[in-house]
Amino acid sequence: MSGPVDRFAIPCFEGILSSDEKKERKSDFENSEDERRTRIGSLKKKAINASTKFKHSLKKKRRKSDVRVSSVSIEDVRDVEELQAVDEFRQALVMEELLPHKHDDYHMMLRFLKARKFDIEKAKHMWADMIQWRKEFGTDTIIQDFQFEEIDEVLKYYPHGYHSVDKEGRPVYIERLGKVDPNKLMQVTTLDRYIRYHVKEFERSFMLKFPACTIAAKKYIDSSTTILDVQGVGLKNFTKSARELITRLQKIDGDNYPETLHQMFIINAGPGFRLLWSTVKSFLDPKTTSKIHVLGCKYQSKLLEIIDSSELPEFLGGACTCADQGGCMLSDKGPWKNPEIVKMVLHGGAHRAKQVVKVLNSDGKVIAYAKPSYPWIKGSDTSTAESGSEAEDIVVSPKAVKSYSHLRLTPVREEAKVGSGETSFAGSFAGYDEYVPMVDKAVDATWKVKPTAINRAPSKGAHMPPNVPKDHESFSARVLVTFMAFVMAILTFFRTVSNRVVTKQLPPPPSQPQIEGSAAAEEADLLNSVLKKLTELEEKIGALQSKPSEMPYEKEELLNAAVCRVDALEAELIATKKALYEALMRQEELLAYIDRQEAAQHQKKNKRKQMFCF
């Protein structure tokens, strides 16, 4: 026999064992093997149960801590043209190594593009200057490094600050410029310290105020509403130090924090200010002027259209007094003062909350819609990987898939982080990049991977779905499924790239040549008209250049004669002035002589009267 019994049979030196003894020993051995397998199986079950309980305990703890975060859904509306521009801008920054992880944000890049009217080269130059300025100024650590102890004195001579939010959830910033005393302000602080304080407050807004408003309003917010009270503003407010401060602050804000103003209301503006504004308005960009509203003394109704009465200070026509906090200008009232919201912000609630991303076309219609569970999913984080099973459905209209199959959403807090050395399904799509857009699957029409393939390829550290076996005997099956999913991912990636390349190379539809032909004709007509005007301009310049640079002889003679005539007139004027002066002097002398004669005659009359009386 060649079975396991023969291998484990005990050799007998006394002779050949009988068949009964062999059967008895065989049955004893089989019983011991069954017992050993039973014990091993029970140990495996206990180990698996213990591991499962441990994982579930971790999941429960994380769910308890994230219960508030997961309940917040933030709406993020994006325009498809802006989306494409930001994606192109992001790729340019990545190629130039100008995109730190901290600033890899869709809305931040969009603000810089808007500031440069979507000129990518100008926006890239502006972005590079901003990165360099942050390094030189120490902006990344200014909140921890800089302490502004004189803030109370500064607020006394320069009343300003945030107070609550408008009806759309944006923070409201108020300045009472008429109460500013620049001289006393510069006595309690310095220009450089105030500028550092200003930058610190801007950084605090992006770290606390804007995220808190985002959570409270349940939509993305990165701009504010400003109210400037110019009552009493005069030349005394615009000293040299004040002008220098305003110039430096405007440069810092415009260069490094662009497009953070949603709208501005200038109230208590007098007739002179409004006349000046109507003149200055013609030199500004129409988009900028549309944000600025100059109001007179009857501004209350306009402000109440934007801000609720309970959120507007009493001195601006609202009902809020903040009496228990020293007044509205000192209260710093807003969602950023809510302990629950602040706790969520400090624990990354604004970044880890569910984001509802809507992509709109030029007509304002939703063409793509996605609800990523958590923006950041780390492959090595068990608790965050758990959220992958909670991902909500993604809906894309057929029209959007047909028209925008090449569109890719740039990662904006909705990315899957793939750790080095980890096997991840999402990681196969971007081996060159650490972050993979989660929404690309919703917009890309070539995404054909079945849900079962996704569910069978969990990343490292992620919990297994219920349909995946967890016992030891299914290990080979899991390895096979993971390998198949990996291969499918690679094939899908290459098919996506090839489809995009083919899409770009496909000939346009039949109606496209007509459109392109008309556009080309219009461009040709425009070019011809420009060339014609340019030719006329060159002819005029040539005619001007052909004229002699010296003055003609006749005109020069006339000019000399005019100069001589002016000289003669000046001489005559001098002589006339001299004669007039002499005449005046003669007149004074005559008047004095007449006065003397009158006095003499008066004395003679008095003497005659006296003699007659005697």
UniProtKB/Swiss-Prot annotation:
Keywords: Cell membrane, Coiled coil, Golgi apparatus, Membrane, Protein transport, Transport
Chief location bin: Golgi
Region Disordered, residue ranges: 19-42
Pfam families the UniProt entry points to: CRAL_TRIO, CRAL_TRIO_N
Basic and acidic residues compositional bias, start-end: 19-38
GO biological process: protein transport
Gene3D superfamilies, A to Z: CRAL-TRIO lipid binding domain, N-terminal domain of phosphatidylinositol transfer protein sec14p
UniProt xrefs under InterPro entries: CRAL-TRIO_dom (IPR001251), CRAL-TRIO_dom_sf (IPR036865), CRAL/TRIO_N_dom (IPR011074), CRAL/TRIO_N_dom_sf (IPR036273), PI/PC_transfer (IPR051026)
Any GO CC annotation of this UniProt entry: plasma membrane
Annotated ranges, domain CRAL-TRIO: 150-324
Localization (cell): Golgi apparatus membrane; Cell membrane
CDD domains: SEC14
Similarity remark: Belongs to the SFH family.
Protein name: Phosphatidylinositol/phosphatidylcholine transfer protein SFH6
Name of the gene this protein is made from: SFH6
